[in-house]
Amino acid sequence: MKKKIPSLALGILLVFLLQYLVAGISTSENDPEGVIGYGYKVKSVKVDSGTRRSLTALPQLVKNSSVYGPDIQLLSITASLESNDRLRVRITDAKHRRWEIPDNILHRHQPPPPPPHSLSSLYRTLLSSPTTNRRKILLSHPNSDLTFSLINTTPFGFTISRKSTHDVLFDATPDPTNPNTFLIFIDQYLHLTSSLPGTRAHIYGLGEHSKPTFQLAHNQTLTMRAADIPSSNPDVNLYGSHPFYMDVRSSPVAGSTHGVLLLNSNGMDVEYTGNRITYKVIGGIIDLYFFAGPSPGQVVEQFTRVIGRPAPMPYWAFGFQQCRYGYHDVYELQSVVAGYAKAKIPLEVMWTDIDYMDAYKDFTLDPVNFPLDKMKKFVNNLHKNGQKYVVILDPGISTNKTYETYIRGMKHDVFLKRNGKPYLGSVWPGPVYFPDFLKPSALTFWTDEIKRFLNLLPVDGLWIDMNEISNFISSPPIPGSTLDNPPYKINNSGVMLPIINKTIPPTAMHYGDIPEYNVHNLFGYLEARVTRAALIKLTEKRPFVLSRSTFSGSGKYTAHWTGDNAATWNDLVYSIPSMLDFGLFGIPMVGADICGFLGNTTEELCRRWIQLGAFYPFSRDHSSLGTTYQELYRWESVAASARKVLGLRYTLLPYFYTLMYEAQLNGIPIARPLFFSFPDDIKTYGISSQFLLGKGVMVSPVLKPGVVSVTAYFPRGNWFDLFDYTRSVTASTGRYVTLSAPPDHINVHIQEGNILAMQGKAMTTQAARKTPFHLLVVMSDCGASFGELFLDDGVEVTMGVNRGKWTFVKFIAASAKQTCIITSDVVSGEFAVSQKWVIDKVTILGLRKGTKINGYTVRTGAVTRKGDKSKLKSTPDRKGEFIVAEISGLNLLLGREFKLVLH
């Protein structure tokens, strides 16, 4: 949102210098050799000979080092094939339980039981293993393509390999001449390195950071610790922590893909050179998950099976949305809604930032500028128009003694503590306490506060912001505390700021005596979890939650926007890699603030931004206090572009929604990099300026000022312009094409082999859902064409569960000689029939020049009828290469199977 922006200049430099006055000594002063660790040698090993799916070993320290604290002497390493496509490697202290994310926070396979008080029986079993003296000990199963190899050298290492290609996916084999490649395990410093095969590996993920390219650049440090830093700052740690990466290999099999998750909630640096990836983590354990793929989509499916599938979003959330920090009163809100209506630009959701609150206190209304009676009338009018209303909540609860939320929070003892009493921070209301969302009573408290507010004002969704946690003050560290001042300094804010800076002190305590140090990165995740649960309980509808801070698995509960970007062309560029990153992270409902949040936008930038932003999964215009107003109707050229691109978006709403169904079912993103559909095309690996919606709709925006063309990459196949079906691009192999992109135009193409079910343009999603369907069939030169459609009421909590409350349709099209056949396969068609949805028109693209269409027949059930020739049109495209065929007036029930034959 809108925190006072750290300049990353003088203020940061002052703190940076102070850090070195109070911090620990440097590596070279701690260890004369400059070596931070000497690694471990394997003491004993055992492979489960029954299932052949697990291996355990006890590595013992080779030599002590004094840097960053005392080494842990004995480790336990467990490698387990949890499924045929997932391998887990867990490394921890063999004698003492350490912090790791509990299963009741992030549900996955049950963690191994705690080590016994006496390990002698374990030692006897393992030491008797005849494999201990072997140089390489394998864990392999005939049903899995993944192999774990324990490298029994001094120091030891391990590798993960793909059997089918003999490719090493993760190589933690130490280089005896380079101590930086040794495993180091200190209480507050874990160090693990994997070598990479240079240019064969293409790495994506490890967020959250703003950057100009989706593929990670070499020679950088990616820091993961949630911080309130504007996303307009590239290459620094931002609001979320996602220690997951995807590796797409260009050989030995082009497109062979795997994923790696380090499930750890502590702060960390990940150094990526191109040849190595090194984890430097300040707590917890090493808990690695390897996902076999081998396709990018399969990797995300396997990854989200562990962290949780994305939550379904309500249908209305795919409409266009408007917000601003600085709407001063309810009359301004009314004016904005009226402005969109007058300009005939679709507006689905109106938002309000902290302006609506009484003295910035959660769950209140400003009695002067946003009085209850006027706000109720405003929201009721939105609902009558088929529109929605969303407001913001910040986690800081004002300590004003007359504030009822504060009083109830104190009564139920729900706040985070430090030194035995609630920790006092400062945010917008002034002094605040923060709820401890690990505490069971916090769910009851939060649910009750939301209930009281919904009874006051029936908002449709909640926006949870500032939940990194952001704090306007930096509390002094507890003297001598290595939690507030850990020995290893992660590259916080890009300048190694102390981790206590402008947030909750790491020594604050959560329920269960868990220090903030360990769960800092989980706060946004936990707040989203309780907020979603509260809304489901209170409304019995599918909730909409938007969170700024996220962690692996947050997609189960929330959507995300990319935070406080700026109205610059650079930020427009950053938005695509950020959107694609969150698709990988299992949060498909994502978008950037359209036209830019910080600073004044321009007409040209805003016009180009709405052209792109109309195709973000989450599409919202948002700007900051003190900036020029940037609603889309403020400039006629922007309004015209908005009508055009949002018109296409609204016709594609059934497609967006079907992609949401696919995402919540198997984790696949809505917006995808090109290599998801074309993994064997190596040129797609480095593309950051284009993206796909689903598998075949490609968006190629203008990202520079003053240009009227764009050079776009087209993978092999025939591609058709979704704004003008008579325009097409043919690529026999992948190639770059310069496309016309006048000021009012963005290039959006659909590839052959796809079928889209679309509806009509409208001002709201509610109105769009009442229009007839239009089937766009893009014939393929290489076989059949396919499409899918999922529909329900858009608000039921689950998708596709309760039979009779949803409809799923598969469309198939194929051609032979002078015949084209289009069929539908319907599952649970009753819902579509009850809504009286019909397919009125079918448009067919990709039919080659010379194809003669003389008529058509339609079969529904046992009845076949001859089509009306007057409803059939056939026109050549602009290049004379294809014809565009269209049949109108079909009136086919969507919920009933049909067969359409053109001859």
From Swiss-Prot:
Pfam families, alphabetized: Gal_mutarotas_2, Glyco_hydro_31_2nd, Glyco_hydro_31_3rd
Keyword Glycoprotein: yes
Glycosylation site positions: 64, 219, 400, 491, 501, 600
Cited InterPro entries: Gal_mutarotase_sf_dom (IPR011013), Glyco_hydro_31_AS (IPR030458), Glyco_hydro_31_C (IPR048395), Glyco_hydro_31_CS (IPR030459), Glyco_hydro_31_N_dom (IPR025887), Glyco_hydro_31_TIM (IPR000322), Glyco_hydro_b (IPR013780), Glycoside_hydrolase_SF (IPR017853)
One Gene Ontology molecular-function label: alpha-1,4-glucosidase activity
Active site: 465, 468, 564 (proton donor)
Keyword terms, alphabetized: Glycoprotein, Glycosidase, Hydrolase, Signal
Catalytic reaction annotation: Hydrolysis of terminal, non-reducing (1->4)-linked alpha-D-glucose residues with release of alpha-D-glucose
E.C. no: 3.2.1.20
GO biological-process terms attached to the record: carbohydrate metabolic process
Keyword Ligase: no
PTM field: Four different forms (I-IV) may be produced by post-translational modification.
Signal peptide (UniProt feature, chain positions): 1-24
Stated family: Belongs to the glycosyl hydrolase 31 family.
Function comment: Alpha-glucosidase I and II have high activity towards malto-oligosaccharides and starch, while form III and IV have high activity towards malto-oligosaccharides but low activity toward starch.
Protein name: Alpha-glucosidase
Species per Swiss-Prot/TrEMBL record: Spinacia oleracea (Spinach)
Lineage, highest ranks first: Eukaryota, Viridiplantae, Streptophyta, Embryophyta, Tracheophyta
